Structures are given as structure tokens and as C-alpha cells.
């Protein structure tokens, strides 16, 4: 809602308003000013909750991400470990911590695994210790300005379904498993995830199904079935 006072001021001063909607569901603030704006920039014209009579205002653009996300290329090495990136953010780190660590330790007994995982600052040492004890190569962080470098190292990402993160992953052709936040307003995270799933870029797992058994089964399947993984990657 940071755009609300800016748009109110622009309306009062007679300044032209241009909106950006990165989600697949039209946000409430954008909905409020849609009638007053000149254009609304989106990643698709198939926005949920968008008035048909105002669709002429839509201008489709490529996702707005930092330049370095477009510049990164895959790092290719022989016999490299399968690298999993886990990006939780403030609303995903705890549930990801509880499930991912056990699965990675189990998978590492039969597979060469590397883990790059975001967690809360208070949990970095504990999580690092668990992976170190299991002799798993790991990078544990609470915040990283240059996320593009970490995405570049990874083979697969586990993430929520925020618009920015999914756009960054898709730009870099990284397949991802997304667990949409169930409490997101207007269910916009599920709609974001569904958009990329329809493009063939990702898999969706509902939060109620996100547990040790299902995640380990999924990752085992991906590691053993490179053809399915490569189809997602090429999309």
C-alpha cells in the first residue's frame, strides 16, 4: 500500500498515473486507482479480478528485475553436486527449516548434495552445524543482496510464490518448487505459482502437503528423472 499516498497526491496535482502489477491478481491499491491511470504495466493480460472494460489500459512488459539477473549464466562443472536453493523470506524460513534439513540429510546418504538455504538470523549457526555434521556442502544465510549469484549456482529452488522471486527464477531459467503462502491476500501467491506452472517452469506443492515424506519423494524423483527436470529448465 505504499503507492496509495503517492497516487492520491498525483491525482490531486493532476499528474499522470502509471501503475505496475507484478502479481497475477490485481492488487487492491491498483484496483482503486485503475480508473484514473493512463496505463497499467503487467506481465500478462490474464489478470484475475481485472475489469473487462479497462483492459485497454494493460501494457504487457517483461518482468522488472535487476540487470544482473539477465546476465547470469549457468555454471557448468563435471560431476557437480545437485544444488538446492531454499529461499524462505520472513514468511517461509521456519516451515522450510523444519522440513528441508531432515530431507537433505537423508538424500545426502545416497546423492551428492549441496544446499544453499535462507533462514532466520538466529538459526544460521544451528542449521549450518546440522549440515556440517552430515558433511553436506552448505551456504546458510539470512539476507543476500546478490541473490542472482546464488540462483546461478543452484539446480533447483524451493520458494514461496512472491512475484519478484518467481520472475527472477524464470528469467534465469531455474526450475523451482513453490509452496504458496496460504494467507496471502486474494490468494495471489497461488495464482502467481499457477501462472508459471502453466508456462512449464515449476511445480506447486500445497502447504498442507509440504512435509518430509512428500519433499523427499519429490526431490528423489527430480534427481533420478533428469528429462523432466530439463523440460522445465528449457521452458
Language model regions located:
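Donor-nucleotide binding loops and adjacent catalytic segments primarily
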Residues: 73, 77-156, 190-194, 205-215
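Acidic donor-binding loop of glycosyltransferase active sites
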Residues: 152-167, 174-175
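An aromatic- and histidine-rich active-site surface loop
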Residues: 1-13
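Short hydrophobic beta-strand element within catalytic cores of glycosyltransferases
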Residues: 159, 175-186
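Conserved donor-nucleotide binding/catalytic region of nucleotide-linked donor-dependent transferases
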Residues: 203, 208-235
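Active-site-proximal region of nucleotide-activated glycan assembly enzymes
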Residues: 11-72, 198
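Alpha-helix C-terminal capping/helix-to-coil transition sites in glycosyltransferase folds
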Residues: 35-36, 149-153, 171
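Short alpha-helical segment that forms part of, or immediately flanks, the ligand-binding pocket
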Residues: 8, 148, 166-174, 194
Amino acid at each position: 500500500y505504499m503507492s496509495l499516498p503517492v497516487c492520491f497526491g498525483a491525482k490531486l496535482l493532476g499528474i499522470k498515473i502509471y501503475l505496475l502489477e507484478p502479481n497475477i491478481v490485481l492488487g487492491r491499491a491498483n484496483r482503486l486507482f485503475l480508473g484514473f491511470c493512463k496505463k497499467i504495466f503487467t506481465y500478462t493480460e490474464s489478470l484475475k479480478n481485472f475489469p473487462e472494460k479497462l483492459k485497454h489500459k494493460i501494457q504487457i512488459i517483461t518482468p522488472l528485475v535487476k540487470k544482473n539477473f539477465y546476465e547470469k549464466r549457468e555454471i557448468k562443472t563435471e560431476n557437480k553436486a545437485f544444488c538446492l536453493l531454499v529461499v524462505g523470506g520472513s514468511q517461509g524460513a521456519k516451515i522450510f527449516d523444519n522440513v528441508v534439513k531432515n530431507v537433505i540429510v537423508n538424500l545426502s546418504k545416497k546423492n551428492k548434495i549441496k544446499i544453499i538455504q535462507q533462514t532466520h538470523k538466529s538459526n544460521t549457526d544451528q542449521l549450518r552445524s546440522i549440515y556440517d555434521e552430515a558433511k553436506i556442502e552448505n551456504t546458510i544465510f539470512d539476507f543476500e543482496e546478490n541473490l542472482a549469484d546464488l540462483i546461478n549456482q543452484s539446480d533447483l529452488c524451493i520458494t514461496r510464490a512472491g512475484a519478484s522471486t518467481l520472475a527472477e527464477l524464470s528469467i534465469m531459467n531455474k526450475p523451482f518448487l513453490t509452496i504458496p503462502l496460504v494467507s496471502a491476500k486474494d490468494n495471489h501467491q497461488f495464482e502467481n505459482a499457477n501462472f508459471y506452472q502453466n508456462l512449464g517452469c515449476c511445480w506447486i506443492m500445497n502447504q498442507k502437503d509440504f512435509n518430509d515424506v512428500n519433499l523427499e519423494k519429490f526431490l528423489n524423483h527430480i534427481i533420478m528423472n533428469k528429462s523432466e527436470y530439463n523440460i522445465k529448465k528449457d521452458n
